[in-house]
């Protein structure tokens, strides 16, 4: 089993549309994306992350549940917000701007992770 621990956030992908820059939200974050891709490749995968108790946190948690990971543990932080990544594509290159200052994903409560529930744990991936 692979356990990926780290950020889960909203990727807001920007597109120019009739002179306005509009954004569509997707669930993302490198550790979460790794978990999803490993699961799609046939691995047994768990993910642990942390979001704020906000509309973005509820959105990414609901989207994460659709990934059908073998284990999903998304903690909720009552004091901090969920990270947002604004992503634009200009001249064929991705440009990132993060709304990230003391956000929930930097404050995972490792004492609340019950590692014993992850049977046959072979790989632990930590990311930000």
Q: Over which residues does each language-model region extend?
A:
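Conserved N-terminal subdomain of the carbohydrate kinase-like
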Residues: 44, 48-128
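Glycine-rich phosphate/adenosyl-contacting loop at the front of the ribokinase-like
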Residues: 1-69, 108-110
């Amino acid at each position: 089993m692979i356990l990926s621990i780290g950020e889960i956030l909203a990727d807001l992908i920007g597109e120019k549309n009739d002179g306005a820059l509009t954004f569509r939200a997707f669930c993302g974050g490198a550790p979460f994306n790794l978990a999803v891709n490993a699961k799609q490749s046939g691995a047994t995968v768990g993910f642990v992350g942390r979001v704020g108790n906000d509309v973005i946190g509820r959105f990414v948690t609901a989207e994460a549940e659709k990934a059908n990971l073998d284990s999903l543990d998304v903690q909720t932080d009552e004091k901090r917000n969920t990270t947002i990544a604004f992503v634009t594509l200009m001249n064929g290159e991705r440009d990132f701007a993060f709304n990230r200052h003391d956000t929930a994903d930097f404050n995972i409560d490792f004492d609340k992770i019950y590692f014993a529930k992850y049977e046959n744990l072979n790989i632990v991936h930590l990311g930000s």
